[in-house]
From Swiss-Prot:
Keywords, sorted A to Z: ATP-binding, Chaperone, Metal-binding, Nucleotide-binding, Zinc
Family note: Belongs to the ClpX chaperone family.
Residues at which Zn(2+) binds: 18, 21, 40, 43
Protein name, as recorded: ATP-dependent Clp protease ATP-binding subunit ClpX
Gene: clpX
Record GO biological process: cell division; proteolysis involved in protein catabolic process
Source taxonomy: Bacteria, Pseudomonadati, Pseudomonadota, Gammaproteobacteria, Lysobacterales
Length: 426
C-alpha cells in the first residue's frame, strides 16, 4: 500500500486518502478500497458524470446521422430496381425503429412498441438485397439466418439463439453493437405449420420453431455462448437483449395469393379494385399479394402470435423481363458492370448488346429464379472466354449478343490488329 495515501493520527489509527483527489476518509462520505488504491464517492460520481456525458454525445451523434425515409429510399433505389411499394414501407419502418430506440433514453410516459417486418415476395425479387442494403446504409451489424435449419431446443438442428450468436460474430462479439443490429430470417414460409388447426404431435421444425422465435423477435435477454451451439455447455454465456434488434422475416409464400383470392371471393369481391381471373398475369398476382391480411398468413400456416409480432408487411412483385434487364445494367453494383470491371483488369473492353441483355432476362424468367439466376447465366456464357483471355494477347474487345446467350455462337473477340469480328475459337 502506497505510503502517501496513508498517515497516522495521534491515537495511532490509520487515515486513508482517495488515490484520485487526495481527500481523506474524514472529508468524504465513503472510501472504497481496491488493490493498493482507494476511491471516494465523489470521484465515483464524477466518473459517472463523464461517462454519461459521452453516452449522450454519442446518442446525439446517432440521431443526427440517422437518415430520413426519403434518404433511405434514395439509397435503396441505387441498388434495388422496382419494388417501390416495398421500399417505401421499409424506409418508414426502419426509420421509426431507430427513432424508437432513441426515445427509450428520454423520460416519456409513452413507450413505443417494436415493429418487426415481414417481406412477402417470390424467389429472386430482392428481399435479401433490401435487408443487406439497409444494414450497410445504417452501418449496423447484419446477419442472415435460414429458417429451414432451425429447430426447437433439444432437437437436432440449430437453436434460435444461434441467430444472435451469428450476429455477435459479425461485430466481434461487441454486445452493445449487436443489440442494435438487423437480423434477416429467410424462408420463413417454410416453417408454417402443416394445417390451420393446432398440431397434436410435435412439429419441431414448423410450429415449434415459430414458438421458439416468438420471444426472440419480440424482445428477450438471450444467453449466447461465444463459441456457439450446444457443444460447450460450461462456457460463460453472453447476455444479449434483443428488444432493439430489428428482425426482418422473408419468404416466397407460394400459394398465398390463392388464400387471399379465396377470402375475397367468400367476402363477395376483392379489395383494392383488383379483379382476379383465371388468366391472371404475374403483375395481377403482385396486386393480390398487396392486399394480404393477418388472417391470410394465419391460414397459410403462421401461428397468430407470430403474425402479431410482425406488424409491418411489405409485398414484392415478381420481376418481369423489363425489370430484369434494368437489374443487369442500372444498379451501382450491376452484374454487367462487375464483369466489365473484371475484363478491364485485363485491358479488354466488354460489350453487351441490348438483344443479349433481353435474352439473359428471358432465360432467367424460364428458370423461375428471378434476379438470382442472372449472374449464373452470364457467368456460364463468359466462362471459356475468361479462362482463355489472360493467356492471349492483342485482344481489345469482347462482344456478347443474343446468339451468344442462346449458345449458338461464342463471344466475339476483336483484336487490336484485326478490327473484324473473329470467333474466340479461331
Amino acid at each position: 500500500m502506497s505510503e502517501d495515501r496513508l498517515s497516522r493520527s495521534g491515537d495511532g489509527n490509520k487515515i486513508l486518502y482517495c488515490s484520485f483527489c487526495g481527500k481523506s476518509q474524514r472529508e468524504v462520505r465513503k472510501l472504497i478500497a481496491g488493490p493498493s488504491v482507494f476511491i471516494c464517492d465523489e470521484c465515483v460520481e464524477l466518473c459517472n458524470d463523464i461517462i454519461r456525458e459521452e453516452l449522450e454525445e454519442k446518442s446525439q451523434s446517432a440521431r443526427s446521422s440517422l437518415p430520413k425515409p426519403k434518404e433511405i429510399l434514395e439509397v435503396l433505389d441505387q441498388y434495388v430496381i422496382g419494388q417501390q411499394r416495398a421500399k417505401r414501407t421499409l424506409a418508414v419502418a426502419v426509420y421509426n425503429h431507430y427513432k424508437r430506440i432513441e426515445s427509450r433514453h428520454k423520460n416519456d410516459d409513452i413507450e413505443l412498441a417494436k415493429s418487426n417486418i415481414l417481406l412477402v415476395g417470390p424467389t429472386g425479387s430482392g428481399k435479401t438485397l433490401l435487408a443487406e442494403t439497409l444494414a450497410r446504409l445504417l452501418n449496423v451489424p447484419f446477419t442472415i439466418a435460414d429458417a429451414t435449419t432451425l429447430t426447437e431446443a433439444g432437437y437436432v438442428g440449430e437453436d434460435v439463439e444461434n441467430i444472435i450468436q451469428k450476429l455477435l460474430q459479425k461485430c466481434d462479439y461487441d454486445v452493445e453493437k449487436a443489440q442494435h443490429g438487423i437480423v434477416y430470417i429467410d424462408e420463413i414460409d417454410k416453417i408454417s405449420r402443416k394445417s390451420e388447426n393446432p398440431s397434436i404431435t410435435r412439429d419441431v421444425s414448423g410450429e415449434g420453431v415459430q414458438q421458439a422465435l416468438l420471444k426472440l423477435i419480440e424482445g428477450t435477454v438471450a444467453s449466447v455462448p461465444p463459441q456457439g451451439g450446444r457443444k460447450h455447455p460450461q462456457q460463460e454465456f453472453l447476455q444479449v437483449d434483443t428488444k432493439n434488434i430489428l428482425f426482418i422475416c422473408g419468404g416466397a409464400f407460394a400459394g398465398l395469393d390463392k388464400v387471399i383470392q379465396q377470402r375475397c371471393t367468400e367476402a363477395g369481391g376483392i379489395g383494392f379494385g383488383v379483379k382476379v381471373k383465371s388468366s391472371e398475369s404475374k403483375r395481377d398476382v403482385g396486386k393480390v399479394l398487396a392486399g394480404v391480411e393477418p388472417e391470410d398468413l394465419i391460414k397459410f400456416g403462421l401461428i397468430p402470435e407470430f403474425v402479431g409480432r410482425l406488424p409491418v408487411v411489405a409485398t414484392l412483385d415478381e420481376l418481369d423481363e423489363s425489370a430484369l434487364v434494368k437489374i443487369l445494367t442500372e444498379p451501382k453494383n450491376a452484374i454487367t458492370k462487375q464483369f466489365k470491371k473484371l475484363f478491364e483488369m485485363e485491358n479488354v473492353e466488354l460489350e453487351f448488346r441490348q438483344d443479349a441483355l433481353s435474352a439473359v432476362a428471358r432465360k432467367a424468367l424460364k428458370r423461375k429464379t428471378g434476379a438470382r439466376g442472372l449472374r449464373t447465366i452470364v457467368e456460364l456464357v463468359l466462362l471459356d472466354t475468361m479462362y482463355e483471355l489472360p493467356s492471349q494477347e492483342g485482344i481489345s474487345k469482347v462482344v456478347v449478343d443474343e446468339s451468344v446467350i442462346e449458345n449458338k455462337s461464342e463471344p466475339y473477340l476483336i483484336y487490336q490488329t484485326m478490327p473484324a469480328k473473329v470467333a474466340s475459337g479461331e
